[in-house]
From Swiss-Prot:
Residues 286-312, 349-389, 680-719 are annotated as: Disordered. Heterodimer of BACH1 and MAFK. Belongs to the bZIP family. CNC subfamily. Its main location: nucleus. InterPro entries: BTB/POZ_dom, bZIP, bZIP_BACH, bZIP_Maf, bZIP_sf, SKP1/BTB/POZ_sf, TF_DNA-bd_sf, ZnFinger_BTB_dom_contain. This is Transcription regulator protein BACH1. It comes from Homo sapiens. One of its GO terms (molecular function) is DNA-binding transcription factor activity.
Amino acid sequence: MSLSENSVFAYESSVHSTNVLLSLNDQRKKDVLCDVTIFVEGQRFRAHRSVLAACSSYFHSRIVGQADGELNITLPEEVTVKGFEPLIQFAYTAKLILSKENVDEVCKCVEFLSVHNIEESCFQFLKFKFLDSTADQQECPRKKCFSSHCQKTDLKLSLLDQRDLETDEVEEFLENKNVQTPQCKLRRYQGNAKASPPLQDSASQTYESMCLEKDAALALPSLCPKYRKFQKAFGTDRVRTGESSVKDIHASVQPNERSENECLGGVPECRDLQVMLKCDESKLAMEPEETKKDPASQCPTEKSEVTPFPHNSSIDPHGLYSLSLLHTYDQYGDLNFAGMQNTTVLTEKPLSGTDVQEKTFGESQDLPLKSDLGTREDSSVASSDRSSVEREVAEHLAKGFWSDICSTDTPCQMQLSPAVAKDGSEQISQKRSECPWLGIRISESPEPGQRTFTTLSSVNCPFISTLSTEGCSSNLEIGNDDYVSEPQQEPCPYACVISLGDDSETDTEGDSESCSAREQECEVKLPFNAQRIISLSRNDFQSLLKMHKLTPEQLDCIHDIRRRSKNRIAAQRCRKRKLDCIQNLESEIEKLQSEKESLLKERDHILSTLGETKQNLTGLCQKVCKEAALSQEQIQILAKYSAADCPLSFLISEKDKSTPDGELALPSIFSLSDRPPAVLPPCARGNSEPGYARGQESQQMSTATSEQAGPAEQCRQSGGISDFCQQMTDKCTTDE
């Protein structure tokens, strides 16, 4: 197992960027390495050029190309201290702190300075949230219905007009990007030549302009015949979709159709057209006038025999609103119907002023979602070639994408009758798939009155995560003939915004119980944020529990939250330890592999050296045998005391007796050149340490006297040969 030479490993820290920003923020507060001074309304702000240039296109154009010395930048009067101070804090901490007092100023400064990574929809959402509905309702009196401009056509006539609808006109209307809005047409219609800024760019616009825009939407059918034909087509489609769902409603209100017709006739048509006109430009600024355009707020209750629907009801007695839109519109609000049984209509007490204010404030959070869903429903109903298979696939994908959000949204579920369960489930899935256009998360900060907005890579829907704070839960049961209002369940203030860490980690004991724990959190109302429970130390946590009087359910919930967070941290540490062990094992394996490679190289080197030594020894023996003319007796003695591995073992051959000494030695040495060295003969072990020169001299002496010496001298000669063999054996043993 060897690693590739081209393998590259990268370590990525998840806290490096955050720590760098925090360090830069500390330097800014201590005026360390700051190289630019910003003057806003006479107040002085110190900062770093690189940070400002990276966060704002305005500062980038002002800073790039300047000298390296101290730089002073005075911002124009459009930028205020109240709006600039949160922005410079955002540049260094990635947290934008907004309140009701500074949201307008911050919005203007963001637009003027071109600050990056801030969603504009965040400000639009807060504008409606911080809007004081009581003051605005007093400034903008209720308008009466324009029955002359909004004459409702008969249902059968609308069905016939749909067949005559010209497709090219509808496509031209949808593709025309420069079409005039109802707001502009109204001002020309009323003779008002003064132009006002768009709703999405104006932070101080009141409900007065919204009421004017409502009048424009009501008067629009008389101005544009093409659009009137277009909205009739949408109206008939909606009737076909919701006809089976609201059949009983239509039957119960049919005797009073004419008394309600004048006020309720044109509202759905105008509503549809307004949504289609303003959807792409201003999703967040469109729906407030829709809430004002309600039947309960426009028609006098004393003139009709039927009690009008409440403030936030979107049911039209004639069925022009599909039931799916009803579910989308009223899922997060209080939906109270008058009891209807056997076509007997019971009058209901009108809503008081405080109820209207609370419902209007609660609905203002859902308006962007409703507008987007209304547009989606119109487009999906109008396209007749969309098959049911595609809808099922879209529903499946939407459920899979928003499964985490839906698991925390348990108190906001709808309980529908079998007649409308299918439509309701389809619209709920559409609702879940409509949120990704708004990529912000709103988390509760420990300080009261402050919220932190963060742009996320994994999109979280702010409306679903915060509507429970304003009372989002309601249970609606719709029967075939009767409508019974359910009491509103008190939601948990922190139920939908609890974030206990990364849910994508490996399952632990706490994660396996996450579903039941979250349900418990939604049922138990906690007096403080769950994030505070996790972040406190043990002593601070105990003191916090002593400060509050908590019920056993609340204590169980708090301890469960803290236990699950500790389990998650312990699991992370365990995974880190395992990763460290794996890395240590990998390093040890690499060391062993390198040692093995070095040992193999050393072995190859030793084998090559041994081969060279054997070759040298064989050549040496051959040379000695050539120089020493051995007699027949000497050869026999040498062969007798030599081992089989000795280079001189050729003397054992029987051919040696008949062949001369010189002719025998040469070929035998060549043939046995690769054999290992010989072992010491027994008679030569006494002379074990003579040198090479001494052995050679003894051989020469024995060679010179071999012919003249007698049998007594042969022992001496054999001792010289033994010395020679001993020398050769010692050398071979040393080399090995």
